[in-house]
Each structure stands twice: as structure tokens, then as C-alpha cells.
Curated annotation (Swiss-Prot):
Keywords: Amino-acid biosynthesis, Histidine biosynthesis, Metal-binding, NAD, Oxidoreductase, Zinc
NCBIfam families tied to this protein: hisD (TIGR00069)
Residues the record lists as binding Zn(2+): 262, 265, 363, 422
Active site, per annotation: 329-330
Keyword field contains rRNA-binding: no
Residues reported in the UniProt entry to bind NAD(+): 133, 191, 214
Protein name in the entry: Histidinol dehydrogenase
Record-level GO BP terms: L-histidine biosynthetic process
Organism: Blochmanniella floridana
Stated family: Belongs to the histidinol dehydrogenase family.
Amino acid sequence: MISTQYLIPTYWHRCSISEQLTLLTRPINKHNNSIHLDVKYILDHVSKLGDNALIKFNLQFDYVNTISLKISPNKIINSGNSLSKPIKKAIHSAIDNITRFHTAQYFPKVDLEIIPGVRCKQIIRPLHTIGLYVPGGSTPLPSTVMMLGIPAKIAQCKRIILCSPPPIPNIILYTAQLCGIEEIYQVGGAQAIAAMGFGTESIPRVDKIFGPGNIWVTEAKRQIHYITNKVAIDMLAGPSEILIIADKTANPIFIAADLLSQAEHGPDSHIILITPDMNLAQQTRQELYKQIQNLDRIDIIHQSLTHARIIITDNIMECFQISNDYAPEHLLIQTQNPENYLKYITNAGSIFLGHWSPESAGDYASGTNHVLPTYGHATTTSALGVADFQKRILVQELTQHGLLQLSSTIQTLTKIEKLKAHEYSVIHRINYIKGTT
């Protein structure tokens, strides 16, 4: 039974500013010097020894003696043979939905005549070589393959490689194949990030690394980005978060289930319910006690609930003010007419509107991406999408007439900034046009 000292509803306006800040403080991110040094050791070895270091670390950390790091095409092709029809059907359905939503994200071309003789364009080019990291662990994560692989394929990246700890389950290989990924390597952890960041005899150096992972993977991404100054990363993943805003129309059974769906991710998961209805808060609290008894990861959930919060506000609008300050990874709005509140939301990774929109839908099959900013980064960072696998290149073309039109503006501004060479790059052309060179 979960301790009754947890999840005690707190009235927001009865708290001091300091207490309010504490209520919204996330669990401390477990980053310490020991992890930094461990990861640095791994990165140094992979940088110097290449594939030999990867084979060594596979044996050391995953207890697998890998003769070949690359998964053979034949194994990928046959990976679906051991999967049941319902599993294949679910994967296909999710891929269809995710593909449809992400295809709609494709950047439109911009081609505009600003003034006569001055044309500006924005052209889109895919990243050439990208690396996808899919964590291992006690259960396979085919959804991560989809969330990374589908937008990469839509963006038309030229070379997509995937790394995952050995032995890689068939369901991961099958899902990757359906997402158009053919280059798969059995290597995990910080060493996989190092391989993609530096390149080895087997694994190419990539332009950008995508994918979640544990604290060692996250630290490896941080260090690789800093060391190479060339390899980009998608984002630094933190513990999972959910914030639910609910009114009296909400169902406490649904709320409890949604909160627990995030609590089971890990002991550092942060779950918050904000409501103006104390009765709903108490009902949800009791429902949490009931539902947790039927779940598998009870110890993890218990740890997560030690820093869970139920906040009582004076009105529904105050809920959104608090949520914007917190900037949650997942924001669920379980109220009457939830779409009316969208205009008040400024900070959130992904929003789930209404009583029939569980967070699990976005995690797997609604079509949106589940790679989202955490730890308050939703104030400045967006969910993963097709744009993250592309770059925008700007083009401008001026005719003689166009340059004559702009010349006085350019020269005036270059004089203000005292950049004479800039000014003369225009003057020489104007003189040529006027025949005075």
C-alpha cells in the first residue's frame, strides 16, 4: 500500500512564493562527476580503439560477445517471422498514423520577390548522415524506432544508421525495416554514442545523433557535442513528466491511470495534478491507491510518487498560469470544452485535449512524436519533428536593377557599422553598372 503521506493536496494560495517554487521543482537531475568521468573513459577508448573498444564494452556491459557489430541484411529481412499477426498489425497501424502526421510537417519552399530585382528563397536540404539510438533494457522499444526513423525518412536523410544494445530483439529489427532503416549496429550505451560521434571501422561518423537513453547516454551526447564541435544532438532527455489540468467534469479513474502511466517510467518521473476541485483531487488520490496494486513496477512508482504533486487552485485559469511556469513535457487538459483553453498555453511539449486523450496515445499511435523536451525546456524547445532532420538554406539573387535599388540602404548601414569593405563591395558594382570603373 502506498504511504498516505504522499499526494496530499496543497492549496496554491496558502503557499509562500518559496513553497510554490518547491512544489514545481523537478527531482534533481542525477549528473555527477563520477558519471562524467566514466563516460569520458568510454569515449576515449572508442575514439582510440574503434570497433575493438565496442566489442569489449558489449561484453563488459551487455554480456554479449559480438563477432560482427553490423546486423546482416538477411537477419533484418527475416526478423518478422517470429512476430505474431496482432503485433505486426499494431506496428503497421502506428507507422501509418505517425507517417501521415509527420508528412504534413514538411517545410514549404519560400520563393519571394522582395522588391523588383531582389529575389529571396529558402531551400530545404536533409541532413546527410544521421544516427538513431534506441535503448535496450528489460523490454524492447519499437515505438522509439518509429518516432525517430519515420521523420528521418520523410526528411529524406541520405544515410540513416541505428544503434541499439545487443542482442537486438526481432521486433526492433522488424520495425526498423518498415521505417526504411537498413543499417543497424548492435552496440548500446555511451559507447554507441561515441561510435556515432567519432566513427569507427564499421560505424560512420554521423552529422547528428537522435534518441533517448539513460544518464550515461545523455552524458555521452553532451560530451560528444562539446568535444567534436561538429556532431549535433537532438536534445538532452530528462525524467518523464506529466501535468494534468482537470475540472469537475473529469473522471478520477482516468486521471489516476494517466498519472501512473508516467510514474512507471522511472523513479525520477514527475507527476502533477492541478485542479480547482478539492473533491476531484481526493477522489483521484484514492483511485491512485487502488490502481497501483494492479501494476507491475510498484517499487518504481512508489519512488516517483514521493515527489508527485496535487495542487488546488482558486479557478481553472490559474491552473494554466502554473502549467506555463512549469512547462511540462506532457500536458493533459481534462476539462469541459478543453479546446477553448489552447490559446492560453505557451509552454508544453505535447498537449492531450479532453477526457478521451490518454498520454499513451501520443506515446504510441496517435501520430504525434513522443520525443519531447523535459526539465522545463519546453519553454524554448519543440517536440521532435521532420525539421530536426533538415536544414534551411537561404538564397538571394539580385539583378543590376535590384542592387541599384538597395545600394543606398546597404551603404548607409555599412557606414553606421564602420565596415568599409562591405560598403565597397557595393560601390564597385554600382560603378561598374554606371560605367565609371
